Amino acid sequence: MELYEAIEKRRTIRDFENEAIPSEIIERIINAGLQAPTNDHMRDWHYIVIQDKNTVIKLLDIIPKGISDEDMEQLLKDWNLSDCEQQSAYRNAVPKQHKMLMDASVVVIPLLKQKTDILHPDNISHLNGFASIWCSIENIFLASTAEGYACTLRVPLGDEDKYAKGVLGFPNDYFMPCFIGIGKPKKDASIIKQKDINVKDRIHWDRW
C-alpha cells in the first residue's frame, strides 16, 4: 500500500474480528514505530505486545465496561462537546473503551524512557520525548493500515497507567502514553465520520 493511500484509509476502529495476527506482521508494525523521528536519537522506546487473553483481561479490569445514557449526556456537557459530529463520535467511542481493547487481536503498550518529568515540564523542550513517542504511535497506526489491520487507542485515565505498571511490570522510569489495540476490522465496523476540512482553508502562506 502506498503511503498516501495508508494515510487516507487509516481510521480508528473499535469493532474487531476474532483473528490472530502473525508474529512477523506484528514485528513489522512495531519496527515501523521504531523508525519514527526521535528527539535525542536514542530511540529509548519499548513496546509490550500482549496476546495472552488472561493478561489482557487483568490489564483492562480497571477500565469501565460501559456508560449509562445519563452519564454519557453529562460527560458531553462537562467536556463542552457541542458539535453534533463530535457528540456522535463520543457516543460511539466511550461505551466501547473496554470492549474495543478486549476484542483486539493484540494490545500494545508503547513506553518511553522518562528523562524529564513529562507531566510537570519546566518548558516545552521537556516534552520532546513525549512528542517523539507519538510519532512512533502514528507510524504503528499507518503500518497496521498498510498490513490490512486497524488500530484503536485509549489514553490512560486516573490511575490506569499505575495499574498497568503493576500488571505488566515495566520500570518506574518508563512512561506509558496509551493503550493500542490492533486487529482486523469487522465488515460492519463503525467508521466515525470525520470533519470535512478543505486544506486550503488551513494553510497560511508566509504569515497568518
What are these regions (language model features)?
Residues M1-D103, R207-W208:
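N-terminal amphipathic, basic helical "cap/leader" segment at the start of enzyme domains
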Residues N39, T145-A146, N172-D173:
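Arginine/glycine-rich "motif VI" loop of SF2 helicases in the C-terminal RecA-like domain
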